[in-house]
């Protein structure tokens, strides 16, 4: 068999024509240490801060510490099968999560993967978890109310769309219930809600998801869950994932509410990671940049300018205090970042005043501008009246010889406290709140025994729904009080027909 030189040369020419000289260059490092959700790798000389890295087993990590000899990496997910000597490669991108309408109604983990057993989430849109907050000129002032349906908040510490309002209090004082009720009240308000659960018991989260489903709130809600059994990196990135999902809707011109429940546990997870990465500890062993941890998150909450679509992202961060100490490190940090705080007191909670909002310590720095005129008018003096009642109440314990005016103030104060109580998962529409508070401040409840106030409230709503729906509709559509003569006449008719249980 003779081999012809022409055939060989033509075959070589064919091979050269089809030769593809594209090379895939990967920068690969070697794992030198792994444990507690942390890995160290040698050889990643050009890696960028916060860059996403991939391990041999498919797990991802984020580059945190860039040192002269190695890189400190936080591992996202399980790290049991990562070994010393495994390879880790750069991806050239930062951590992203899936976003968009496909996530609404779903329960996902901080990586955007479904954990509700309802199948995969079909979306091709992603967003980086870290992004720059809108600048001063990209925002507008908060001017639209976000109704929580909770009388004590909408009247005393109103929240505007685009605001950051801290919910702070000891454990078991109703912080989560308050946030869930706010989500429930957004039904029909064209607000998309994102509930980020950080380190909450999985049984508790399950119960909350069932409540949201039962009351129809999952139709406009995304739940991001990082359970206590998850590694610390998952608890650390959960709030950033949640706000990235919200930003997608905000930049599309929609209104979004994001609840972070709670950021104390995220700070603890970040402290754990920082200590494992050998970063120097500071006050309460937190690292020096723990303020930046929360400020860069909450600054992404905004009311965008009209040029950018006018969307808004309202943040309700939750912080847990120890024995009511709001002067601890993390509480003071977050108080200074946010636009106000709602302080829940355990003494009030256990005495039966629920929601246990301490009107004296709670404040809303920008929400007042967003309050509807009708509510501003009826609730104007409510805070000072309540504060003077608390003061008088402590003096009244020492003697019974009180003048008529003081007794009247005490009687009005008791009724005010009773009016601001509210059962769980029963948000009240703002127009009904206005009518109720008008009745309180104009003396229509002065003759009603304190024990009958709750019944008076329910019967008042029923009466107005049946006989004065036009007045409620006017408050709802205009945001202003209707003709006061008509309103007073309607309240007078109802008050005279109301029978107290003492009779």
From Swiss-Prot:
User: What does the record give as the reaction this protein catalyses?
Assistant: ATP + H2O + 4 H(+)(in) = ADP + phosphate + 5 H(+)(out)
Listed A to Z, the keywords are: ATP synthesis, ATP-binding, Cell membrane, CF(1), Hydrogen ion transport, Ion transport, Membrane, Nucleotide-binding, Translocase, Transport
Keyword Transport in annotation: yes
EC number(s) stated in the UniProt entry for this protein: 7.1.2.2
Q: Where does the record place it?
A: Cell membrane
Q: Which parts of the sequence bind ATP?
A: 169-176
Q: What is its main location?
A: membrane
Cross-referenced PROSITE patterns: ATPASE_ALPHA_BETA
Identify the CDD domains for this entry.
Answer: ATP-synt_F1_alpha_C, ATP-synt_F1_alpha_N, F1-ATPase_alpha_CD
| A GO molecular-function annotation | ADP binding
Q: Which domain of life is it from?
A: Bacteria
InterPro entries found in the cross-reference section = ATP_synth_asu-like_sf (IPR023366), ATP_synth_asu_C (IPR000793), ATP_synth_asu_C_sf (IPR038376), ATP_synth_F1_a_nt-bd_dom (IPR033732), ATP_synth_F1_asu (IPR005294), ATPase_a/bsu_AS (IPR020003), ATPase_F1/V1/A1_a/bsu_N (IPR004100), ATPase_F1/V1/A1_a/bsu_N_sf (IPR036121)
Q: Does the keyword Cell membrane apply?
A: yes
Q: One GO cellular component from the entry? A: proton-transporting ATP synthase complex
SUPFAM superfamilies in the record, alphabetically? Answer: C-terminal domain of alpha and beta subunits of F1 ATP synthase, N-terminal domain of alpha and beta subunits of F1 ATP synthase, P-loop containing nucleoside triphosphate hydrolases
Name the enzyme's class. translocase
- Return the similarity comment: Belongs to the ATPase alpha/beta chains family.
Q: What does this protein do?
A: Produces ATP from ADP in the presence of a proton gradient across the membrane. The alpha chain is a regulatory subunit.
The record's annotation in PANTHER family points to:
ATP SYNTHASE SUBUNIT ALPHA, MITOCHONDRIAL
- Subunit (UniProt): F-type ATPases have 2 components, CF(1) - the catalytic core - and CF(0) - the membrane proton channel. CF(1) has five subunits: alpha(3), beta(3), gamma(1), delta(1), epsilon(1). CF(0) has three main subunits: a(1), b(2) and c(9-12). The alpha and beta chains form an alternating ring which encloses part of the gamma chain. CF(1) is attached to CF(0) by a central stalk formed by the gamma and epsilon chains, while a peripheral stalk is formed by the delta and b chains.
Q: Identify this protein by name.
A: ATP synthase subunit alpha
Q: What is the lineage of its organism?
A: Bacteria, Bacillati, Bacillota, Bacilli, Lactobacillales
- Gene name per UniProt: atpA
């Amino acid at each position: 068999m003779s081999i012809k030189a022409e055939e060989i040369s033509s075959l070589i020419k064919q091979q050269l024509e089809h030769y593809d000289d594209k090379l895939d260059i990967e920068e690969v490092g070697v794992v030198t240490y792994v444990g507690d959700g942390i890995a160290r790798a040698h050889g990643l000389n050009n890696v960028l801060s916060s860059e996403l890295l991939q391990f041999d087993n498919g797990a991802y990590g984020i580059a945190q510490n860039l040192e002269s000899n190695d890189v400190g990496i936080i591992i996202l997910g399980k790290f049991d099968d990562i070994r010393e000597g495994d390879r880790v490669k750069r991806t050239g991108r930062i951590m992203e999560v899936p976003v968009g309408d496909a996530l609404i109604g779903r329960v996902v983990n901080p990586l955007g993967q479904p954990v509700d057993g309802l199948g995969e989430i079909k979306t091709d849109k992603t967003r980086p978890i870290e992004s720059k907050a809108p600048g001063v000129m990209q925002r507008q002032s908060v001017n639209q109310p976000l109704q929580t349906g909770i009388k004590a908040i909408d009247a005393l510490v109103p929240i505007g769309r685009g605001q950051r309002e801290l919910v702070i209090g000891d454990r078991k004082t109703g912080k989560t219930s308050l946030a869930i009720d706010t989500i429930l009240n957004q039904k029909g308000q064209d607000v998309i809600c994102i509930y980020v659960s950080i380190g909450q018991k999985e049984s508790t989260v399950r119960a909350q998801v069932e409540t949201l489903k039962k009351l129809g709130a999952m139709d406009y809600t995304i739940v991001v869950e990082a359970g206590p059994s998850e590694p610390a990196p998952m608890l650390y990135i959960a709030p950033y994932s949640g706000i990235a999902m919200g930003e997608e809707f905000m930049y599309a011109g929609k209104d979004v509410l994001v609840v972070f429940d709670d950021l104390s546990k995220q700070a603890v997870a970040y402290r754990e990671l920082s200590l494992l990465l050998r970063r120097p500890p500071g006050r309460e062993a937190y690292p020096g940049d723990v303020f930046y941890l929360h400020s860069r998150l909450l600054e992404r909450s905004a009311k965008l300018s009209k040029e950018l679509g006018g969307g808004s992202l309202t943040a309700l961060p939750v912080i847990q205090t120890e024995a009511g100490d709001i002067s601890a490190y993390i509480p003071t940090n977050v108080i200074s970042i946010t636009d106000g705080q709602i302080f829940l007191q355990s003494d009030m909670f256990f005495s039966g005043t629920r929601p246990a909002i301490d009107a004296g310590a709670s404040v809303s720095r920008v929400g007042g501008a967003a309050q509807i005129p009708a509510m501003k008018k009826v609730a104007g003096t409510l805070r000072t009246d309540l504060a003077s009642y608390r003061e008088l109440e402590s003096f009244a314990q020492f003697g019974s010889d009180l003048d008529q005016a003081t007794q009247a103030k005490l009687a009005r104060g008791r009724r005010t406290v009773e009016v601001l109580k509210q059962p769980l998962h029963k948000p009240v529409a703002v127009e009904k709140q206005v009518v109720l508070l008008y009745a309180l401040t104009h003396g229509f409840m002065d003759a009603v025994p304190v024990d009958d106030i709750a019944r008076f409230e329910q019967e008042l709503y029923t009466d107005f729904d049946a006989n004065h729906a036009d007045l409620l509709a006017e408050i709802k559509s205009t945001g202003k009080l209707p003709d006061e003569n008509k309103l007073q006449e309607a309240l007078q008719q109802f008050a005279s027909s109301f029978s107290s249980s003492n009779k």
